[in-house]
């Protein structure tokens, strides 16, 4: 009997990337149209922010994008009690009819930073080269930084912008156990279980928005510039359980020059869960997971042939199905 202990560090994910997307021409809809649609049903008298009232603290509203867009001048309503909204980017034409401004283009810039790092403490035991057992305890550290800037340009210099900031930090733990059995000299059978990673996470988020608008008022051209922001100390603590995984494998040595291996993995995406910090279930999110995800199956088959003592050729195929459930027609 022999045994060993090991420690390892792995960077599982690097989030660093920057990208820009832009579009031009006559676009049909604006971000302001989308925000106006989202705000439908909310009394406009409750969306406005002043020194005596903070709509972000109003539990009955619950949609910060609508609040931010309203205070940034994206949309208007007919009166303070009205619950229907329209994009502010337009004006009455010569016939008195409402005419939207031409949306000439939009641009999105995104910057992402962060990583997922894992620290493993592993233990293994070998029993007479017939049975090999292993176990690993892992601690995972996650940090993610997201910044985005979105701009739209209308005719006559009218414009809007939306900036988003998100910081996510979390720590998780997991364990893996496995065994390899050699019932015969030419055959190896293996099984392993990778537990979920249980994360404790914190999201910190902040948004800024603004607009510049020109319009006619009693025959006189006027302009309006508005800027708004969400509270800068907003955060959300939660817990997340990632999918667990089973692995089954077999390998056969054929003579002295060939090897065939088969691996099967079962990834249980349907077991993902979100929780509040008090341990209660995030009912709506978890129901979405149950409704939309299932287990994913992966099969890998490979073969290796040793052409010379120093050179071998290996080939293989793999198949995975989708973890997304098919929508019923």
Residue positions per predicted region:
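Outer-membrane beta-barrel porins/channels
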Residues: 2-329
């Amino acid at each position: 009997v022999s045994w060993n202990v090991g420690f390892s560090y792995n960077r599982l994910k690097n989030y660093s990337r920057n990208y820009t997307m832009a579009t031009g021409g006559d676009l049909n809809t604006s971000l302001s149209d989308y925000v106006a649609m989202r705000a439908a049903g909310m009394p406009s008298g409750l969306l406005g922010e002043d020194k005596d009232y903070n709509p972000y603290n109003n539990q009955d509203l619950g949609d910060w994008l609508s609040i931010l867009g309203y205070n940034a001048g994206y949309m208007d309503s007919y009166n303070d009690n009205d619950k229907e909204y329209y994009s502010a980017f337009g004006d009455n034409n010569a016939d008195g009819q409402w005419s939207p401004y031409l949306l000439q283009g939009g641009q999105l810039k995104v910057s992402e930073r962060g990583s997922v790092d894992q620290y493993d403490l592993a233990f293994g035991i070998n029993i007479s080269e017939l049975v090999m057992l292993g176990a690993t305890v892992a601690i995972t550290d996650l940090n993610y930084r997201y910044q985005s800037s979105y701009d739209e340009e209308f005719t006559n210099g009218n414009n809007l912008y939306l900036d988003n900031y998100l910081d996510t930090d979390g720590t998780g733990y997991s364990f893996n156990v496995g065994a390899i059995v050699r019932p015969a000299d030419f055959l190896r059978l293996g099984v392993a279980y990778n537990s979920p990673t249980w994360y404790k996470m914190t999201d910190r988020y902040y948004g800024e928005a603004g607009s510049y608008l020109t319009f006619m008022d009693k025959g006189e051209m006027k302009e309006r510039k508005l800027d708004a922001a969400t509270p800068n100390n907003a955060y959300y603590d939660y817990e997340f359980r990632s999918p667990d995984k089973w692995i089954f494998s077999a390998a056969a040595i054929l003579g002295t020059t060939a090897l065939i291996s088969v691996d099967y993995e079962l990834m249980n995406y349907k077991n993902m869960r979100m929780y509040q910090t008090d341990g209660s279930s995030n009912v709506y999110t978890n129901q979405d997971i149950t409704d939309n995800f299932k287990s994913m199956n992966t099969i890998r088959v490979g073969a290796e042939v040793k052409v010379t003592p120093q050179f071998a050729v290996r080939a293989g195929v793999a198949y995975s199905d989708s973890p997304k459930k098919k929508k019923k027609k």
